[in-house]
């Protein structure tokens, strides 16, 4: 059994981002700039944003945090996004999710110009992804794919089950893996028997946020298991995932830990996406 070490792989990729940025800075170019919009006081969002900003600072990306009260109205948020869209010194815009219930997430994600859409959620970028064109990919799905590549795992011809069909992880990941030649099954809350799908899968990817939904009896021998879940165990207060790691790992050929698996890769991909958008802007 091999641990898919997202911390290690992400560290290497962050170093490469920093090296590329240093080359541009030495040529006299400005720093890349990421604008982050954070609304409300959600503790998880606060932590995620803090980690993203720290990562930016380490590689030489300038970050700008725009904080708003959870009662912000739609017009104010729309005006702020438009201002960032038109700011020539801002390369990438991140709208931290989830938004308060009175705000339409899709409307505001689509308000971000695709030229600064660091999360790859704009319809134009998603359409390019669907057709197999190079584009800005959503951070967690491309992070998972690059983690597998780092360990020379070829997904072509593999049977893969994805549990969770969100627009952020499950759906884009299914498209990307299909484009790479995998056979993908998607399971959701209405799926009658998860085990029916997971038990025959070469790779199982769980992104539900439900603690230990994936158990030993659901996995075939030598399967690869990717755990996207991040949950605080109410009893131990430790961070755990969707997968019952200690019992499942003995069956696996490869498995991601929680924490230290998918999470660090997501942050590294945010930095890479910011760099990619920056390169396009300074060429224009």
UniProtKB/Swiss-Prot annotation:
Source organism of the structure: Mycoplasma capricolum subsp. capricolum (strain California kid / ATCC 27343 / NCTC 10154)
Catalytic activity: (6R)-5,10-methylene-5,6,7,8-tetrahydrofolate + NADP(+) = (6R)-5,10-methenyltetrahydrofolate + NADPH; (6R)-5,10-methenyltetrahydrofolate + H2O = (6R)-10-formyltetrahydrofolate + H(+)
Keywords tagged on the record: Amino-acid biosynthesis, Histidine biosynthesis, Hydrolase, Methionine biosynthesis, Multifunctional enzyme, NADP, One-carbon metabolism, Oxidoreductase, Purine biosynthesis
SUPFAM superfamilies: Aminoacid dehydrogenase-like, N-terminal domain, NAD(P)-binding Rossmann-fold domains
Function noted in UniProt: Catalyzes the oxidation of 5,10-methylenetetrahydrofolate to 5,10-methenyltetrahydrofolate and then the hydrolysis of 5,10-methenyltetrahydrofolate to 10-formyltetrahydrofolate.
E.C. no: 1.5.1.5, 3.5.4.9
Amino-acid positions noted as binding NADP(+) in the UniProt annotation, renumbered to this chain: 164-166, 230
Subunit structure: Homodimer.
InterPro entries on file: Aminoacid_DH-like_N_sf, NAD(P)-bd_dom_sf, THF_DH/CycHdrlase, THF_DH/CycHdrlase_cat_dom, THF_DH/CycHdrlase_CS, THF_DH/CycHdrlase_NAD-bd_dom
GO BP, one annotated term: L-histidine biosynthetic process
Listed GO MF terms: methenyltetrahydrofolate cyclohydrolase activity; methylenetetrahydrofolate dehydrogenase (NADP+) activity
Domain of life: Bacteria
Manganese listed as a keyword: no
Full protein name: Bifunctional protein FolD
GO cellular component, one term: cytosol
Pfam families: THF_DHG_CYH, THF_DHG_CYH_C
Family: Belongs to the tetrahydrofolate dehydrogenase/cyclohydrolase family.
Pathway where it operates: One-carbon metabolism; tetrahydrofolate interconversion
